[in-house]
Amino acid sequence: MRVKRESIMAGRARAAVVVGLFVLGLSFPHAQQPQVDLILSNGKIVTVDERFTIAQAVAVAGDRILAVGTNQDVSRLAGPATRRIDLRGRTVVPGLIDNHMHLLRYGTTWKYEVRWDGVETRKAALDLLRARTSHVKAGEWIYNLGGWAIEQFSDDAKPFTREELDKVAPNNPVFLQASYYEAYLNSRALQALGIDQNPGANGVVKDAAGRPTGRISEEGFRALVNKLPTAEGADLEASSLGMIKDLNRSGLTAFGSAGCEADVLPIYRRWADQGLLNIRVFCITSPGGGGNPDAVTQLLPRIAQMKLFKGDNYINHHAYGEGVYGALSDPMFRHREQTRAQDLEQWRRITMEIARHGLPLHVHTNFTETIDAFLDQIEAVDKEYPIRNLRWALAHFNQPNAAQLERMKKLGVYAAVHPWAVINGGINVRQFGDAAYDMAPLALIQNSGVTWGLGSDGSRANQILPFQTLSWAVTGKMVGGKKVLRQTISREDALIAHTRKNAYFVFQEDNLGSIQAGKLADLVVVDRDYLTVPADQIKDIQPVLTMVGGRIVYDAAAPTSTQ
């Protein structure tokens, strides 16, 4: 499929270096010139502005970008206290934004986890697990709570067994959650959770002798996750800080948080007030409830009391979501019941109230049938309370068709695309057949005129590395190299979807998403040129420096202890 380019410049013509100097305030007497704290020069600054301009240098004053332009012009702004970074030809992109992640709550388990995001072989995965055992005491839990699938292992993509995990971690209970479809446990974990004594428990897969294999199906593992120990108090803060460091290391500087738990968010607020928060959090939240008609009646007054946009550019609440009515579920792999008219009626009651109060909406919507059903209700709501300027979004969005996209365009509904195929592409093919190769149809979405952005739905349903997501969008390949997507897009349009378009989604288009004078200085210096590196190497791009609000929050050259 031929894809429209988002900007007015096409192909390599976008690589022309900007000639002028774009400065906050345009011009000013020397005495009024803000102090330039930092200049990055001799680089390839991929601004991702409306013209996809390429510059050489950028100046930062405080937490904002003061100027973008040529080396010579930007250098003139330097003062005696200005710090300089010679990029030596390296590429700089805007801080990457994920429009939908589940992370605040997962800070409670991050310290126990061995992440396999981007790991392509079973051997490498097991080596990481084995290495972890040398850093924990005997008997301590080791987790991997999602963000991977056995399909990503190019050398051996079969389920793990308890015996295999026993060899790697004989003295520690191990719990490995593969995305949201199954889990694998070693013998110590089976014993700790009482499964050896109760092999008939829900979801336990047994061998011919009736002995648990260590494999737990989706029907059973979710309940087990809730029995695992979590970090609290000071450990919770340390675990969450470790998670944020990993996000910064990946190039992420902001994310839409699907859920901002009341017991965790104050910690982030304190860090932000102290100038210590190294990532921006934009909350998708709701008052809860709404599982039956009576509960909906009780919920409606609470919607009127919701307070959005009362924070700042580090923490803010920007949308209602991601669930609306509990009886309407659209899960990844489980059997989906047919949508009932009475449930859609309750869904419409809630969304009508959301629209009446002028609130943005971000709603979990996966498959074709659900998209149709929800658009029917949204069109009915729109007749009573127009939603065009509310930035309502359908999230996940794996199976849209052209007719649905046209309806969304007329309504002004946004698409938050979360490609589960990055790790679950093989499973999608088994479950959906040929249709899986159009999940999600990026070229169709790009051509439709619907505003859309890329996210992950990490860290359990999907991996969290933005360059892995960008690689999938451009090459159509999942982790491990299997082609799982037909409708790919250009690397420019993919980057726009992971930066500028997501800034719009979280109502931060004046602050984030591009490297322009006046915007917040969220930047990522990478080890190779995103625009020219062979497409199959996009997944391997590594940030060497990440900046949030003019502060360096990750520096690959720094000692490990300070990264």
Label every model-predicted segment.
Residues 352-362, 366-392, 396, 402, ...:
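His/Asp/Glu-enriched, well-ordered alpha-helical/loop segment
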Residues 91, 141, 520-523, 552:
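Residue-level marker of beta-strand positions
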Residues 31-41, 46, 50-304, 313-370, ...:
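Divalent metal-binding segments
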Residues 16-27:
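Bacterial N-terminal signal peptides
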Residues 414:
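Ligand-binding beta-strand-loop-alpha-helix segment within the catalytic cores
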Residues 2-18:
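Bacterial N-terminal signal peptides that target proteins for export
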Residues 555-563:
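Extracellular/periplasmic ectodomains of large secreted or surface enzymes and adhesion receptors
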Residues 308-310:
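Accessory "access/gating" subregions that flank catalytic or transport cores
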